[in-house]
């Protein structure tokens, strides 16, 4: 004879713990989600980082390629002895001579101040540009390469000139860097030019004659 408890189970059915888990129509239609592949975590930590590194390298290569149009070299004819001697007459004559700029730039490289000449040349090229779209792009590159405090080739400019450039960069023009170019020109004239005239480089040219060609690497 069943006990009262067993009789109650017969009437009400099995307890919840005894019932098999019910399955919804959604559960029966969809297969169980696969277990997480341990390789997924490895891809997130390794492959994605490698992909980001590739993107950074591609961005850097693109930026460097954009900087190539900036004037970085000049090829010039062999200077005559008279031309070499004229460089000592004034800094203007040196800077107006392609061969003079080439030799002077090589000298600045030995003093780790070549960026001054590069900046001056870039400003000269900018002033000769008439296309506004090209002016905007070149002005941005000049700023990033020679004016920004984050650049390894930053030139020495006072705060007044820097503030003026920052304002002009809102609407760049071919003359955005005129004040800065003059300041760097004056710096090279007063600081580097006297040392250049007394350097072995210039003295050798005075004695050498016209046999050696002058070009910038």
Curated annotation (Swiss-Prot):
GO BP, sorted A to Z: autophagy; G protein-coupled receptor signaling pathway; negative regulation of signal transduction; small GTPase-mediated signal transduction
Entry annotated with the keyword Cytoplasm: no
Annotated PROSITE patterns: RGS
CDD domains linked to this entry: RGS_RGS19
GO molecular function terms attached to this record: GTPase activity
Domain RGS: 90-206
Tissue specificity remark: Highest expression in lung. Placenta, liver and heart also express high levels of GAIP.
Keyword Transmembrane: no
Subcellular location: Membrane
Residues that bear Phosphoserine: 24, 97, 151
Variant or mutagenesis effect after changing residue 151 to A: Diminishes gap activity towards G(i)-alpha3 and autophagy in colon cancer cells
Region (Interaction with GIPC): 207-217
GO CC entries: Golgi apparatus; membrane; plasma membrane
PTM summary: Fatty acylated. Heavily palmitoylated in the cysteine string motif.
Region (Disordered): 1-29
Disulfide bonds: none
Key words, A-Z: Autophagy, Lipoprotein, Membrane, Palmitate, Phosphoprotein, Signal transduction inhibitor
Topology within the bilayer: Lipid-anchor
Superkingdom of origin organism: Eukaryota
Subunit and interaction comment: Interacts with GIPC PDZ domain. Interacts with GNAO1.
Entry function: Inhibits signal transduction by increasing the GTPase activity of G protein alpha subunits thereby driving them into their inactive GDP-bound form. Binds to G-alpha subfamily 1 members, with the order G(i)a3 > G(i)a1 > G(o)a >> G(z)a/G(i)a2. Activity on G(z)-alpha is inhibited by phosphorylation and palmitoylation of the G-protein.
PANTHER family hit by this protein: REGULATOR OF G PROTEIN SIGNALING, REGULATOR OF G-PROTEIN SIGNALING 19
Designated name of the protein: Regulator of G-protein signaling 19
Gene name tied to this protein: RGS19
């Amino acid at each position: 004879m069943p006990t009262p408890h067993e009789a109650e189970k017969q009437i009400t059915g099995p307890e919840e713990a005894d019932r098999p888990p019910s399955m919804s129509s959604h559960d029966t239609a969809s297969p169980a989600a696969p277990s997480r592949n341990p390789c997924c975590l490895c891809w997130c930590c390794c492959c994605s980082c490698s992909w980001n590194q590739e993107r950074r390298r591609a961005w850097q290569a693109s930026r460097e390629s954009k900087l190539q149009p900036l004037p970085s070299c000049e090829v010039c004819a062999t200077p005559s002895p008279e031309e070499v001697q004229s460089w000592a007459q004034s800094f203007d004559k040196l800077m107006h001579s392609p061969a003079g700029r080439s030799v002077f730039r090589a000298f600045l490289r030995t003093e780790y101040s070549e960026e001054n000449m590069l900046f001056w040349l870039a400003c000269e090229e900018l002033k000769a540009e008439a296309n506004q779209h090209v002016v905007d792009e070149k002005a941005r590159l000049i700023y990033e390469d020679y004016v920004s405090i984050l650049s390894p080739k930053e030139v020495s400019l006072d705060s007044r000139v820097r503030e003026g450039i920052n304002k002009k960069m809102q609407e760049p023009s071919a003359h955005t860097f005129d004040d800065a170019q003059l300041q760097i020109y004056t710096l090279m004239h007063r600081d580097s030019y006297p040392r250049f005239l007394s350097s072995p480089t210039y003295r050798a040219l005075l004695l050498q004659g016209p046999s050696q060609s002058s070009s910038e690497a």
